[in-house]
Amino acid sequence: MKLKIFIVLVAVVLAWFAGRSIKGGGENIVASVQQQVQGGDDVATSHGASERRINESYELADGAHVDVHGINGPVSVEAVDGNMAEVRVTSTAGSMNDLNENQIIVEHTDSSLVVRGKGNNGWGFWKWLRGGGEARHNVVLRLPRNVELATRGTNGKVTIGEMEGSVQVSGVNGRVEIGGARGFAEVNGVNGGVMLTITELDKEGAKVNGINGVVELRLGSDVNADLNLNGVNGQITVEAPNVEVHEQKRSKLRARVGTGGAAIKANGINGGVRIVGV
């Protein structure tokens, strides 16, 4: 019962946060639109609906930080070789005014890339609840695989390819899929299922917390880790061949992956956990 109450509270907070991130911004957003770089954006209006496209490329230094937040729609990240990042965004709304009030801002330096939603006032959350003034975004990024990636406040599915740098995902209303984490990986506050593939693990390990959905941990044969699950409301199944279970109860599990090592922790899962090999 305590877990169910916790999950409900997480969902309520997540909805509030996503609303503010997607629509609000309030007094903290005092930034100019910086997406008119290398060609700018394209705007079109057809049959009463408006659409804006961003198609940009940027060069990033090794280990650059990439932050994606406040997106009302799906986010897809493809990992690529080299140091060039590509940003592809399609935004749609019922009117040009709604489109302008809910733009996507792209900010870039040699060591950072930010892709974020922007609202012109602090009333966006209530406007969203009333079903008005909404713009939808489809964000597709091609990023150097060694960047440090963080996404937060996403109202839609988040899909991330095989990254070598750290990956942090939080505040998602939708499914999360991470195709391959080699650095530190953390997933928090997701209203949807999570699939996390771990092919290697650094000393910081991996964390999955506050998930309202089934979690699938896909472990590579070379992974050595200590696995701890707590507060799981659902079935726990272990199918990976390199996992030795030391303790398993209805809502918890303690196991060793390979020869043991960095910690893989999962807490507050409302939907069960599957542990499989890749």
Per-segment meaning from a language model:
Residues V80-N83, T109, L201-D202, D222-V223:
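Short strand-connecting beta-turns/loops that link adjacent beta-strands
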Residues Q34-Q36, I71, T154, V172, ...:
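Sensor of tandemly repeated, compositionally biased sequence architecture
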Residues R53-A61, H65, P74-S76, E101-G179, ...:
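Right-handed parallel beta-helix
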Residues K118, A185-N188, G193-V278:
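Short, surface-exposed interaction patches in beta-rich subdomains
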Residues G94-L99, G179-R182, G189-N191:
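Long amphipathic alpha-helical scaffold regions
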Residues K2-M84, T92-L99, F125-R142, V243-G260:
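Short acidic/polar N-terminal linker immediately downstream of export determinants
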